[in-house]
Amino acid sequence: MQNSKKIIPVLILIGLICLPIVQFFGNYNYVIHMVLFCFLYITMSSSWNIIGGYGGFISIGHNVFFGIGAYFSGFIYARYGISPFYTAVFAGLIATVFGFGVGLITLRVKGPSFIISSIALLMIFRTLFDRWELVGGAHGITLPHNNLSVEWSKIPHYYALLVLMVLSIFLSWYVRHSKFGLALRSISHDEIKSEVTGINIKIIKVTAYAISAYMIGAAGAIWGDYLTYVRPNIFFIILIAANMVLMCILGGK
C-alpha cells in the first residue's frame, strides 16, 4: 500500500510529461490548454495553501503577486526582448520581496480584518495599474508571439508550468513537514500560546506570506507570456484569488 502511494504520483507525472505527444496524432490544442490551465491553478493554490491553509490567513487578494510577476516579466520582454522563461525566477523573487513588505503591514490584523485588507490591496493595485502609463495603463502590455506552429506553440508554457506545479506541490509538502510548518500551524490555532512557547509569530507569518508569493509570481510571468498580453482586468481580479481559496477548501490542506 505504501509503495502504491509513492508510485501513483510518479506515474501521473510521467503521463503528464508524455501528454504533448498526442499532438503528433492531431490538433489537441484544447486538451493541452485545459491541462495547462490546471497546472496554473494547482501551482497557485498549493502556494496559497502555505499562508491560507497552514497559517489560517485567508487572503482574497493573493493574485496581486500573480499580476506583479506577469507585469515584471512582460515589461522586460516588451522592452528588452528577454523571454519570461528566463525572467520568471526573478519575477518570483520580486513577488517574494513585495510579499514580505505587504506581510509586515497586513498580518498585524487577522480574521475578517485581514480578509478586507487583502481585498483592499487587490483593488489598490487594479487602480494603480489601470492608470500607470509606463506599463500601458488599462490597455496593458502586448507581448510577441513565439515562432512555433499552432500545434506546438503551447508546449513550452506547458512544460514551464508543469515544473512550477511540481515545485509548488513539493514546497507546500516540505513546509508542512518542517519545523517552520509546525510553528505556522500552531500559530493558526492559537497565536498567544504559540508566542508563549517561544515562537516568533511575526517572523513566521511574514515569511510564510513571502514564500507563498514566490511561485504565484513566477506563474504570472509564464501565464502572461502564454496569453501574449498583460492587463489589469485579467490579472488583478478577485475571481483568481477566489479560485485559489476554493481549490484549497475543496481539496483540503
Predicted stretch roles:
Residues M1-T43, F72, R79-T87:
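Membrane-interfacial amphipathic/re-entrant helices at transmembrane-helix boundaries
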Residues N27-R79, I105-F114, I187-V196, N200, ...:
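Single transmembrane alpha-helix segments in multi-pass membrane proteins
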Residues F37, Y41, A70-Y71, G92-T96, ...:
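Residue-level recognition of pore/gate-forming positions within transmembrane alpha-helices
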Residues S46, I50, A88, G92, ...:
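Hydrophobic positions within alpha-helical transmembrane segments of bacterial inner-membrane proteins
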Residues N63, V89, V206-K253:
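Transmembrane alpha-helical segments in multi-pass inner-membrane proteins
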Residues V64-F65, V102-R131, F235-I249:
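Pore- or pathway-lining transmembrane helices of multi-pass membrane proteins that form conduits
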Residues L121-E151, G181:
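Extracellular/periplasmic helix-loop junction at the C-terminal end of a transmembrane helix
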Residues K154-R231:
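Helix-loop-helix "hairpin" substructures at the membrane interface of multi-pass membrane proteins
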